[in-house]
């Protein structure tokens, strides 16, 4: 069983007298900076000159500095940046200031696991990864709670890397819920696998294939959208609250019977073998190598995939149907806009 740490395992006083630089002010960065500040920590935010987030962070009472200055001033540096941006920013602005005795922290292990960032000896390297989007990390903290998190140590130069990481997690509010000890490799590999096989790749492909099957069989696209896309949230919410058993308790007996009889026909031995190959590509670094090369080349395939899927009929039908349902708080992505 995993080691799980709570409030009594974490001493926030370990952060006293130390400045924490949160590099980035996006989804995770803003939550980290504000939660730590309200937990009594000395926090600065590191941003590039001209960042749209600069005035926003200052407006929330945070001290903002250029990235290099923030890294120089701080004793603890948290990289709360997109994976693809971290290596260059670390090389140019952060690495030169990672002197012995400092701590370099991550909210995701990609760049350490795949060797894109190699910290110097004498520096603690750890990770605190809240298991929720930044807005949720912030919201739950302000309500007096916390979201679970993962904690890991890659390099323990001081002998106190885990204790300091747990103190940081307490500053975020995560020890109120529980912090699970892991490794950079486990966090990174399972995170990528979950995204590819279930949360993004698997679900997206399943929804599109089911929608296409119904439409090709002559059913109306609008009805197919409701059955294959819209109602998915109803089921996922049940998973979220009580797992598979609660979902089956909540749906009709007919739906439950279909679950048992049809599900194994969708997830076949061949599908499981494919999952294992995907995991092997993640573990070997093949996926990371491909993704890093894609970014170096200007993302031609990535952009082509995005353009292709924006034009899928399920997106066109969904856009129209969501206008009928303002209560779902519809969102529309403008072509060319990026995500995280």
From Swiss-Prot:
Pathway: Amino-acid biosynthesis; L-isoleucine biosynthesis; L-isoleucine from 2-oxobutanoate: step 2/4; Amino-acid biosynthesis; L-valine biosynthesis; L-valine from pyruvate: step 2/4
Cofactor(s) annotated in UniProt: Mg(2+)
Binding-site positions, NADP(+): 25-28, 51, 53, 83-86, 134
Catalysed transformations (reactions): (2R)-2,3-dihydroxy-3-methylbutanoate + NADP(+) = (2S)-2-acetolactate + NADPH + H(+); (2R,3R)-2,3-dihydroxy-3-methylpentanoate + NADP(+) = (S)-2-ethyl-2-hydroxy-3-oxobutanoate + NADPH + H(+)
Binding site for substrate: 252
Any GO MF annotation of the entry: magnesium ion binding
Pfam families cross-referenced by the UniProt entry: KARI_C (PF01450), KARI_N (PF07991)
Binding site for Mg(2+) 2: 191, 227, 231
Superkingdom assignment: Bacteria
Entry EC no(s): 1.1.1.86
All copies of domain KARI C-terminal knotted, residue ranges: 183-328
Protein name in the entry: Ketol-acid reductoisomerase (NADP(+))
Organism: Roseiflexus castenholzii (strain DSM 13941 / HLO8)
């Amino acid at each position: 069983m995993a080691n799980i740490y709570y409030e009594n395992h974490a001493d926030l006083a370990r952060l006293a007298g130390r400045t924490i630089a949160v590099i980035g002010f996006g989804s995770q960065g803003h939550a980290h900076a504000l939660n730590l500040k309200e937990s009594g920590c000395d926090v600065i935010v590191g941003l590039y000159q001209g960042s749209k987030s600069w005035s926003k962070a200052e407006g929330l009472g945070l001290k903002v500095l250029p990235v290099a200055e923030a890294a120089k001033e701080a004793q603890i540096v948290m990289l709360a940046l997109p994976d693809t941006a971290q290596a260059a920013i670390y090389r140019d602005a952060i690495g030169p200031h990672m002197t012995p005795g400092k701590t370099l922290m991550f909210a995701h292990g990609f760049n350490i696991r795949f060797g894109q960032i190699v910290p110097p000896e004498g520096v603690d390297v750890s990770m605190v990864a809240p298991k929720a989007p930044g807005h949720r990390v912030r919201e739950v903290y302000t309500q007096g709670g916390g979201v679970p998190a993962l904690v890991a140590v890659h390099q323990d130069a001081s002998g106190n890397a885990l204790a300091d990481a747990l103190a940081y997690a307490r500053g975020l509010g995560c020890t109120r819920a529980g912090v699970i000890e892991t490794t950079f490799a486990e966090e990174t590999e399972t995170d990528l696998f979950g995204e590819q096989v279930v949360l993004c790749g698997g679900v997206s492909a399943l929804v599109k294939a089911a929608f296409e099957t119904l439409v090709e069989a002559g059913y109306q696209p609008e009805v197919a959208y409701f059955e294959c896309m819209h109602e998915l949230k109803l089921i996922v919410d049940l998973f979220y609250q009580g797992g598979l058993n609660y979902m089956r308790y909540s749906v009709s007996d007919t739906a439950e019977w279909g679950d048992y009889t049809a599900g194994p026909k969708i997830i076949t031995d061949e599908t499981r073998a494919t999952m294992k190959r995907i995991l092997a590509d993640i573990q070997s670094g093949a996926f990371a190598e491909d993704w890093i090369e894609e970014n170096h080349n200007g993302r031609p395939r990535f952009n082509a995939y995005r353009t292709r899927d924006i034009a899928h009929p399920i997106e066109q039908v969904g856009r129209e149907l969501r206008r009928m349902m303002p209560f779902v708080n519809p969102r529309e992505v403008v072509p060319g806009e990026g995500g995280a």
